[in-house]
Design a protein with these regions (language model features):
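Charged catalytic carboxylate motif
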Residues: 31, 35, 88, 95, ...
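Hydrophobic alpha-helical core bundles mediating ligand binding, dimerization, or RNAP-core interactions
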Residues: 86-93, 199, 217, 229-232, ...
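Glycine- (often His-adjacent) and acidic-residue-rich active-site loop
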Residues: 41, 56-95, 111, 139-141, ...
């Protein structure tokens, strides 16, 4: 499919989705929502994809909502922002979280508003040292959406979550990596190589195990310890019968690189 606002392809097990409105810092309009929704639906049914890399074109990752888009811009008739969230952002965040494969956010510049929370919805967030994050909502009279009020306190605690949300300060990715909000920062000149290396490594990893790891960590946010122990038991039982486990042990004993198939 020819997309108007994104680039999407799958090569060697790595799916890449690039938000492609660099002149607007890759902010979302109605067309971009449609394009991303279609790409994620295609990804769901693509058995060759083993990892998704989400990034932005140009100097920004994503500036959130394009406020000039007529569907959300204030005018004579006030736009229903709740309807926009229900139609676009809620399905987007849930679709990302529910993907069975690892999702890697490659934050190459500013991540603002819903764009920041789009990154936080991913499993791994790697940013350039020059990148920045800002919860810009309060500056225009709104609250963090796209899961912001859910992700922030869980990742950095209520004190820092409230500071980020109430003050709307732009903070460097280096500081947020120190806080544990994102996985790591990488020198700008090494960023592309680092993302490619991480993506290739995840694509070559035991897919079924990664899927169960992702599910278990997400479930831990609401499970009791006993429920989590039961989940680990059931998942480990399944993985213990997998071809990838047999291959992993055989490769370890033979001192060779494993060749995982995702089975």
């Amino acid at each position: 499919m020819n997309y108007q606002t994104i680039a999407y392809n799958v090569t060697d097990g790595v799916a890449r989705l690039t938000l492609n409105r660099p002149e607007r810092l890759n902010s979302f309009n109605a067309q971009m929502h449609e394009d991303v929704r279609h790409a994620l639906a295609a990804l769901q049914s693509d058995d060759t994809a083993r990892v998704l890399v989400l990034t932005g074109a140009g100097r920004g990752f994503c500036a959130g909502q394009d406020l000039s888009d007529r569907t959300v811009a204030p005018g004579t008739e006030r736009a229903d922002l709740g309807a926009s969230i229900e139609r676009h952002y809620k399905p987007l965040i849930l679709a990302l979280r529910r993907l069975p494969i690892p999702v890697l956010a490659a934050v190459n510049g500013v991540a603002a508003g819903a764009g920041a929370n789009l990154a936080l919805a991913c499993d791994l967030v790697v940013a350039t040292r020059s990148a920045s994050f800002v919860q810009a909502f309060a500056r225009i009279g709104l609250l963090p959406d796209s899961g912001g009020t859910w992700f922030l306190p869980r990742l950095v605690g209520p004190a820092r979550a409230l500071g980020l949300a109430l003050l709307g300060e732009k903070l460097p990715a280096t500081q947020l990596a120190e806080w544990g909000l994102i996985w790591r920062c990488v020198d700008d000149e090494d960023f592309t190589a680092e993302i490619d290396s991480l993506a290739a490594g995840l694509a070559a990893a035991p897919t079924l195990a990664l899927r169960r790891i992702k599910q278990a960590v997400h479930a831990a946010w609401h499970n009791t310890l006993e429920q989590q122990l039961d989940l680990e038991r059931d998942a480990q039982r399944e993985l213990g019968y997998s071809a990838d486990y047999a291959e992993g042990v055989a490769a370890f004993m033979a001192k060779r690189e494993p060749r995982f198939t995702g089975r």
